[in-house]
Amino acid sequence: MSRNKELGRKIRLMKKIKQNRRVPGWVMMRTARKVTQNPLRRNWRRGSLKI
C-alpha cells in the first residue's frame, strides 16, 4: 500500500485497527464470561478489508 494515503482511507483504516482488538477483561467479568470473543477480529494475512 502506498505511503501517502488520503484522509478518508486513513480514518477507515484506523477504525479497523481499533476494531481488531480482543474483548477487555472487565467486559468478560461484567457479563459472567458470556462475552469472551470479538466477532470483528481479523488476521492481517487471512482477512481482507472492504475499504
UniProtKB/Swiss-Prot annotation:
Signal peptide: none annotated. GO terms for cellular component: ribonucleoprotein complex; ribosome. Pfam families: Ribosomal_L39. SUPFAM superfamilies: Ribosomal protein L39e (SSF48662). One of its GO terms (biological process) is translation. Keywords: Ribonucleoprotein, Ribosomal protein. The keyword Ribonucleoprotein applies. The keyword Ribonucleoprotein applies. GO terms for molecular function: structural constituent of ribosome. It comes from the Archaea. HAMAP family: Ribosomal_eL39. NCBIfam families: PRK01242.1. Belongs to the eukaryotic ribosomal protein eL39 family. This is Large ribosomal subunit protein eL39.
